[in-house]
């Protein structure tokens, strides 16, 4: 049994021999969203020598120039705006050797209707450029998420399914760009014989990417670093249900492993799967872990005194600039590394748990210890000098 089905924390931190002779690759990946929280893990894991059907040749696509924290990955980096069909056609259609597409990106708009339009267009642009031009294209992995079962953020109070959330639950009666993406995927794969697909639905992701719009661990690290700098208590910015109730999460490396499994295992084709760590935790316990990692006083949930990170952090830009200067950190702006709105949603609501039974029934036995996962990603945020 390979390491990615054994749940090894940090297994992807192996290094590739830079003097290794060039080889002919049977597997060629296109990662769309390579600087995202899962795309970054895919870029680290796919090129490893013991990855199934690997090592892989990897193309990585992102809108912005390549960041320094992504430079060690042995991939071909392509800066491309996938909302721009002309840019996509020019830069992606020449990649005729691609065998697998890992689509792990999204864009945020002010309404779900606009989310559907923009995110649908992005996916369609990529598939229109790749499917007709890649004769050996075998499989497309589409990453969506648990909002498939819960609804869009703007519809957060609609009637939802009763957990545990299973893959066979019907769609909610509301707009959801995940549904738009799935429909586009199902339509486009029909255009090429034997082309298969998989859909992956993680929960709250623990991982590393300063560019991610939904980076909970990185955001909490920034919050804790500011509390440490100011000598403040690490107050819990959430609700009682999140503090006392059971939560789960999805390790970014585990999600990457899950997608690779679905891409190469015949028994995982043409299916949608949940992907979470396989255990549960309480934020009141993880809050102590976070406080210990930064040497700050741990706060508690305060009944009737709920706070939001968006409010606590709204004037902290100059404080963050000072922390960056004094500690020689990578140059970042607070608004780039602090996803306060997302953290407030996660910690301001009870967690709706899913189940991994379907993945296990189809042969994926990967898991993570969520506490160890949390600590390992905090360590990585520190190692790349995002926080002191």
Curated annotation (Swiss-Prot):
Classification via InterPro entries: NAD(P)-bd_dom_sf, PRISE-like_Rossmann-fold
- Return the EC number: 1.3.1.122
Q: Which cysteines are joined by disulfide bonds?
A: none
Single annotated GO MF: oxidoreductase activity, acting on the CH-CH group of donors
- Write down the superkingdom of origin: Eukaryota
> What's its job?
Iridoid synthase that catalyzes the first step in generation of the iridoid ring scaffold using the linear monoterpene (6E)-8-oxogeranial as substrate. Iridoids comprise a large family of distinctive bicyclic monoterpenes that possess a wide range of pharmacological activities, including anticancer, anti-inflammatory, antifungal and antibacterial activities. Catalyzes the conversion of the linear monoterpene (6E)-8-oxogeranial to (S)-8-oxocitronellyl enol, a precursor of nepetalactones, which are metabolites that are both insect-repellent and have euphoric effect in cats.
What is this protein's name? (S)-8-oxocitronellyl enol synthase ISY1
* Record organism: Nepeta racemosa
The record lists the lineage as: Eukaryota, Viridiplantae, Streptophyta, Embryophyta, Tracheophyta
């Amino acid at each position: 049994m390979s390491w990615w089905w054994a749940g090894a924390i940090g297994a992807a931190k192996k290094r590739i021999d830079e003097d290794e002779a060039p080889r002919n690759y049977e597997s060629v990946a296109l990662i769309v969203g390579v600087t995202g929280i899962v795309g970054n893990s895919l870029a680290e894991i796919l090129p490893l020598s013991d990855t199934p059907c690997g090592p892989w040749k990897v193309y990585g696509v992102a809108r912005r120039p390549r960041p320094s924290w992504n430079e060690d990955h042995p991939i071909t980096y392509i800066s491309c705006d996938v909302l721009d069909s002309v840019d996509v056609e020019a830069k992606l259609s020449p990649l005729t050797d691609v065998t697998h597409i890992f689509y792990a990106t999204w864009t945020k708009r002010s309404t779900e209707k606009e989310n559907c339009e923009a995110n649908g267009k992005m996916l369609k642009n990529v598939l229109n450029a790749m499917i007709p031009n890649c004769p050996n294209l075998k499989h497309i992995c589409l990453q969506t998420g648990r909002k498939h079962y819960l609804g869009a953020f703007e519809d957060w109070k609609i009637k939802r399914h009763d957990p545990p959330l299973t893959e066979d639950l019907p769609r909610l009666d509301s707009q959801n760009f995940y549904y738009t993406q799935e429909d586009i995927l199902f339509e486009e794969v029909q255009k090429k014989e034997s082309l298969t697909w998989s859909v992956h639905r993680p929960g709250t992701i623990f991982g590393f990417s300063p560019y991610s719009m939904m980076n909970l661990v990185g955001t909490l690290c920034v919050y804790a670093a500011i509390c440490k700098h100011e000598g403040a208590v690490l107050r819990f910015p959430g609700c009682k249900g999140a503090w006392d109730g059971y939560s789960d999460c999805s390790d970014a490396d585990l999600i990457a492993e899950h997608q690779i499994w679905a891409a190469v295992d015949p028994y995982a084709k043409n299916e949608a799967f949940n992907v979470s760590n396989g255990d549960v935790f309480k934020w009141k316990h993880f809050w102590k872990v976070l406080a210990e990692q930064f040497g700050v006083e741990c706060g508690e949930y305060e009944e009737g005194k709920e706070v939001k990170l968006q409010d606590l952090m709204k004037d902290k830009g100059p404080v963050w600039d000072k922390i960056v200067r004094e500690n020689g950190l990578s140059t970042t702006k607070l608004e780039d590394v602090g996803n306060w709105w997302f953290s407030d949603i996660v910690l301001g609501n009870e967690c709706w748990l899913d189940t991994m039974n379907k993945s296990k029934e189809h042969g994926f036995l990967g898991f993570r210890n969520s506490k160890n996962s949390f600590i390992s990603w905090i360590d990585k945020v520190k190692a790349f000098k995002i926080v002191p």
